[in-house]
């Protein structure tokens, strides 16, 4: 059938819609500078950081962003857009990774730790990381929001023209201008103990660097300092605070018995520090020699040599807090902590890289560097002579020296602990542990099994022995795992949250390991002639709230406690229990002096009657008449005479201590220098192998 003729449309033509206005292609260069400012702001707000330093990290972010923004301008529009999306995703991944590291491990990690991270097994932290991912999902979405919007909308709203060449020059100039403006603000007259200018010239205090300078600048400075280490800015005003006359400053140590004549000569060695300073190979060695030469040594006392010739077993207990000790649930820990030396003001502050640098304090008597390289690992990499470590001191005295850890080679311990002087055994190098069908460690390893599978190495030795255990059962996360299972009925009856119940089970496992150890020593007839030393490496920082339940106290808001924000928490969260015990002790010895992990090595060296030089350690013999001091990672500190808050720059005298304002100002100024010196000396000792200059390895 023929269709009827249809006439063409004779009505009004409808004009097509005008093209959507698009932004010039060169405006894409603004994205990365603004993204970095956004990411820094989200990171700071999420971490509860002070925003007063926003101008600094905003300017440095704009500078770095302008430089990266060149990748958005130099090529064709499609390549520019894809490169920008890729860089946006990578930068966001970097920020979220650092955010999660701070949330779970209480530390930001610079790029120089990548080698360590690659060598470690993140499976140890997988449960905590997955939990943190889930708990912070809304924040992670906020981090990634700009990248998602860019990927979806950039092509739609940008022209397809090639950006003019002069736009690249504009952003390159912007990078320089913003960087110079950032430096100007950094060197403005900021107040405080750690100013932006001081942090900018330093490779330590990473958390403060992130807060004041920004994450991007911390990472940039880290890369710079890998090739150009910062020069020391320490002065040589080595005056020490005067000897206190206040109660408690001498330690308030109650003697076991009165000794008619006590040798109170200084614990020093016959070394020529002045001569070393004069002939030093560099400024750092000269500074160290002069500093140690000016330091007042601690004196021998009525406890010197109390355990001379004893076997020595030292334990660093993973994630341990004395708030968990209970006479019924942990009877062995209770017995040892109440029947030996009883330390009422002992602290285990959380320093950089937690366990590794908890060991640094305990084994070296030195505060760890608050940054990279990781101190304990570095000693193994360099082969630094740890002359005063118990392993070396007792090894020179003819002891059998062994060390054990129920894990893989984390933080390079096979090298570092062998270098300390231990015959080191861990999984894969001589220590047998339960494994899975695939041959991996049945995680976590049981502390009781580590004791059971190692004790025969030394228990029947004809020579004295020194054994070091780094335990593992208390490793986070605190969930119903193979460590908790044997104690499940007991802990589920406790009036705590499930996390706290599970944490208690890990402490019970450490308690049973100690019980087994004492039983083995007693059966071998070695118990009365053995000194037991035990401390935590750090508190359970991933779940510090459990300590509020166990102690019945409040240490800060939930957010501040979760982040261990030292500007807002009660430092008693770090209060802990130090065990120094022998079955030969007739009665306990109460010690009220302020002390911490670095004090263990000199205290034990004196108790064993070893020859050591007390000037060359950051710790002090707790049982001597020296003033007690505990330094926290933020550089706040507590001494026998009071507490100094670095954030408020205020000093609160201890109970019973009276000072005029002038005396207080002089004391605080002097102590702040001592704190700086004790923190700064460690990397110089390690990097220059300082002890080896005085005591060359044979």
Give residue spans per PLM region:
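Transmembrane and membrane-interface helices of multi-pass
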Residues: 2-268
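Helix-hairpin-helix/helix-loop-helix acidic hairpins
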Residues: 235, 257-294
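Solvent-exposed soluble domains appended to multi-pass membrane proteins
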Residues: 278-698
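Alpha-helical scaffold segments in carbohydrate-active enzymes
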Residues: 92, 196-200, 271-274, 513, ...
